[in-house]
Amino acid sequence: MEAGRTAVLRVKRKRNAEPAEALVLACKRPRSSEVESAARETPEGQEAAAAERNVFQLVATVRSQEEPIQQLVRAALRPSRSSQLRIRRDLRASVREVRKEGRYRVVSSHRSSGTSNSLEPQCGSEAVGDAGFQLLDLVHEEENPEAAATDCRKTSDPDVILCNSVELIRERLTVSEDGSQVNHQEDPKHNDDYVYDIYYMEMAPPGWIENIMSVQPYSQEWELVNDDEQSEDIYEDEDDENSENNWRNEYPDEESSDRDEDSRGSDEYNSLSEEERSCERLMWSKYPLDVQKEFDYDSPHGLDSD
């Protein structure tokens, strides 16, 4: 597949089940020598170089697999790509662990011959091989806890494709040399309880259809929540400065502060030696005489009268 070719997913699901807004396909990324050397530096670089996430948006839902989809895909390519960019930004801020909301089993893949880039139907029929995009059929199956636990033990096999820790079963499609379909393996039982959701990606990377690692439904619940900010808000609510019980509003009593000062002075006096105490008493006894000389008083009675 050439770079920039449109890719389409056709997902078979039960009619009463809710379709996903978008699907995220993790594909193995081809590595060059420069990418490999950069990936060895950090674990994040190794993970980024090993897998590439591709977002497929929901276009429409059809009632049967025989309904043409070229018109739906062509109409979806006309609007701006702002919604797809928004999903990509949200995806970068998503958590790594995803809820088990079901699994997707690969049924078949239709590869285009690469002779035309147009989405116009050929001869009035749905020419999948010459429609200018690649089509991959998936089946959405309800999660079976017992089967999921059994398949989780198969993760050691590097050739196993996992979706939410569940093995994907790829049913290959035989294609002739001219690009026409030869054998399309399909369930012979037709069930009216199923519908088909059409997803598309305008700029799919080369080789994505052969290197699928996992298929996950996109959800807004993947957005990160900063728990630290929430805890800080709780602490701010509890620490009200205007509250009477706040420790900042506790002031000591004036009487107790005076008693504390007196006790501190008494402790300091008791800590002095006998010689230091006699010197201090002598200084206090000479204090009135010094004041009398300074202010030219003739007798201590004049000092008391002031």
From Swiss-Prot:
Residues 31-43 have a biased composition (Basic and acidic residues). Its main location: cytoplasm. Keywords: Cytoplasm, Nucleus, Phosphoprotein, Protein transport, Transport. It comes from the Eukaryota. InterPro entries: SLC7A6OS (IPR040218), TF_Iwr1_dom (IPR013883). Residues 231-243 have a biased composition (Acidic residues). Signal peptide: none annotated. Residues 30-49, 231-278 are annotated as: Disordered. One of its GO terms (cellular component) is cytoplasm. Pfam families: Iwr1. GO terms for biological process: hematopoietic progenitor cell differentiation; protein transport. It is found in: Cytoplasm; Nucleus. Disulfide bonds: none annotated. The modification Phosphoserine is found at S299, S305. Belongs to the IWR1/SLC7A6OS family. Directs RNA polymerase II nuclear import. This is Probable RNA polymerase II nuclear localization protein SLC7A6OS. It comes from Mus musculus (Mouse). The gene is Slc7a6os.
